[in-house]
C-alpha cells in the first residue's frame, strides 16, 4: 500500500492575504466510513500554497474565479432535496472540524472520493470537476426555501503533471478530461473555504421556524463509456454569526418622552418617559430600564404595563403557500413587472411582560403635575428570542413597549423602543 502526495492547491488568510496559512492535519483515510481493501491505493492531495489574492489564484487546483455559481433558489433547492447521490463503485464523503462555523473564518476540510474498480476488468473514471456548495434553508410550517447560497467550482482539467508525485506507477493520471482513476483507490481533496460574513442570522430553532445550514460537495464523473454521472455528499453544520466589539457596543442610551394634554390648548398633564442604556441585548439577558411619569389628568389610569413584543414579517415566495396565500398567474405577471407589491403577512406576539400599579389614579389626587414618579423596571428576554432579517423573505423584530392602561382602554399613552436581540452561544 502506497501513499502518494499531491501538493497542488492553495490556502488563504483572512487577516493578511499575503500570509500563507497551513491546513490542519489531514484525517486518516481509514477513519472514514468508506474503508477500502488493503490492496487499494491511496492518493492524498495536500494544500500548502500561497494565494496572494483571492481572485487571482496562482495554483493549478483552485476554485475558478469566473465559474458560474448556483444563484438560483431552484438549483439550491434541488441540492437540498437530493442531499445524497450515489454511483456504483463510487462514494464521496466530507470531513471538517466538529465545531461551529463562525462568519468570516477560514474553514479547512477534506473531500474523500472512494473508488472501487472491478478486478481483472479494464475500467476507470474521470473526475472532471467539483462543486462545493454552502447554503442556508428556511423551514417554516413544513415548507422549505433557500435564503442563502454560495458555490465554488473546482476544475480537475489540465492540472500540472509536475505537481503530481507518484511513487507507484499509474493508479492515477491527468489529462484534458480531468483526473483519471484506473483502479481502486481513495483520493482526498483538501479545500480552504472562507465562511462569508453575510451568511444571515445563523442557525436558529423554534417550534415553527428553523434556519439550517449545509455544506455539500458534488463531483462530476465521466466513465470510459462517456456516461456523465454525479456523486454528492451533504452534511449539516451549525453556524454562528460574527460578533465584533464595535458592533456589539453595550452602552447606547435611548430616551423617549410622550405626553397627554388635558385639552388641546393646555399644557401636558400626563407624561411618560422611558430610559434605557442599551438597544442591543443577548438572548436570556435582562433589560433594565427606567420609567418616569407624571399624572394629573381627568382620565383614571390604573397601572403601567411593559411588554417585549416579537413581530414576524413574512414575504412569501410566489411558489410557496405561506399563510395560505399563493399568487395566480396574472398576479405573478404584474409582480414581475413591478406593478404589484409582494404579499406580506405580519404577526405580533408578547414574549415577556410586567405590570406596575399607579398609586395616584385620578386628577383628584394630591400629586402635583410637575412631580415625577420613577420606576426601575426589568424584563427578562427568553432564551429562544433572536432578531432575524432575511431581506425579502422573513424578519423577526423586537420592541420594548411601555404604556399607561385602564380597565376599558389598555393603551392610553404608549412608548415603543426597537431593540436588537443577538443569540448567546455561551
From Swiss-Prot:
Pfam families: Arrestin_C
Keywords of the record: Cytoplasm, Meiosis, Nucleus
Subcellular location: Cytoplasm; Nucleus
One Gene Ontology cellular component annotation held by this UniProt entry: plasma membrane
Keyword Nucleotide-binding among UniProt keywords: no
GO biological process terms on file: meiotic cell cycle; ubiquitin-dependent endocytosis
An MF annotation (GO) of this entry: ubiquitin protein ligase binding
Family: Belongs to the arrestin family.
Function (record text): Has a role in meiosis.
Protein name (Swiss-Prot/TrEMBL): Meiotically up-regulated gene 170 protein
Lineage: Eukaryota, Fungi, Dikarya, Ascomycota, Taphrinomycotina
Amino acid at each position: 500500500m502506497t501513499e502518494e502526495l499531491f501538493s497542488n492547491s492553495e490556502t488563504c488568510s483572512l487577516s493578511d492575504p499575503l500570509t500563507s496559512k497551513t491546513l490542519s492535519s489531514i484525517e486518516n483515510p481509514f477513519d472514514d466510513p468508506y474503508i477500502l481493501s488493503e490492496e487499494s491505493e491511496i492518493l492524498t492531495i495536500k494544500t500548502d500554497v500561497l494565494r496572494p489574492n483571492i481572485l487571482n489564484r496562482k495554483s493549478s487546483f483552485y476554485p475558478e474565479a469566473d465559474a458560474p455559481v448556483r444563484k438560483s433558489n431552484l438549483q439550491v433547492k434541488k441540492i437540498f432535496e437530493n442531499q445524497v447521490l450515489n454511483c456504483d463503485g463510487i462514494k464521496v464523503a466530507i470531513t471538517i472540524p466538529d465545531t461551529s462555523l463562525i462568519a468570516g473564518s477560514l474553514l479547512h476540510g477534506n473531500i474523500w472520493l472512494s473508488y472501487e474498480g472491478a478486478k481483472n476488468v479494464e475500467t476507470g473514471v474521470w473526475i472532471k470537476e467539483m462543486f462545493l456548495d454552502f447554503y442556508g434553508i428556511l423551514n417554516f410550517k413544513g415548507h422549505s426555501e433557500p435564503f442563502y447560497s454560495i458555490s465554488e467550482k473546482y476544475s480537475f482539467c489540465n492540472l500540472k503533471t509536475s505537481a503530481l508525485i507518484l511513487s507507484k506507477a499509474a493508479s492515477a493520471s491527468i489529462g484534458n478530461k480531468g483526473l483519471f482513476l484506473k483502479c481502486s483507490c481513495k483520493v482526498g481533496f483538501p479545500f480552504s473555504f472562507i465562511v462569508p460574513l453575510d451568511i444571515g442570522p445563523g442557525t436558529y430553532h423554534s417550534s415553527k421556524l428553523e434556519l439550517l445550514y449545509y455544506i455539500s460537495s458534488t463531483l462530476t464523473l465521466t466513465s470510459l463509456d462517456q456516461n456523465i454521472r454525479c456523486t454528492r455528499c451533504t452534511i449539516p453544520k451549525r453556524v454562528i454569526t460574527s460578533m465584533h466589539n464595535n458592533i456589539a457596543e453595550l452602552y447606547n442610551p435611548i430616551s423617549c418622552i410622550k405626553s397627554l394634554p388635558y385639552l388641546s390648548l393646555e399644557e401636558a398633564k400626563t407624561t411618560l418617559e422611558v430610559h434605557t442604556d442599551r438597544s442591543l441585548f443577548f438572548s436570556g439577558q435582562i433589560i433594565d430600564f427606567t420609567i418616569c411619569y407624571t399624572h394629573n389628568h381627568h382620565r383614571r389610569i390604573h397601572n403601567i404595563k411593559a411588554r417585549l413584543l416579537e413581530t414576524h414579517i413574512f414575504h412569501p415566495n410566489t411558489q410557496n403557500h405561506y399563510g395560505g396565500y399563493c399568487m395566480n398567474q396574472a398576479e405573478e405577471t404584474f409582480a414581475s413587472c413591478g406593478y404589484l407589491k409582494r404579499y406580506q403577512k405580519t404577526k405580533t406576539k408578547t414574549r415577556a411582560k410586567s405590570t406596575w400599579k399607579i398609586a395616584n389614579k385620578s386628577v383628584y389626587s394630591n400629586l402635583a403635575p410637575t412631580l415625577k414618579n420613577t420606576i426601575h423596571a426589568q424584563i427578562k428576554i427568553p432564551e429562544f428570542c433572536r432578531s432575524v432579517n432575511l431581506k425579502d423573505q422573513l424578519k423577526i423584530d423586537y420592541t420594548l413597549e411601555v404604556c399607561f392602561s385602564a380597565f376599558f382602554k389598555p393603551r392610553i399613552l404608549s412608548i415603543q423602543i426597537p431593540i436588537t436581540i443577538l443569540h448567546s452561544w455561551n
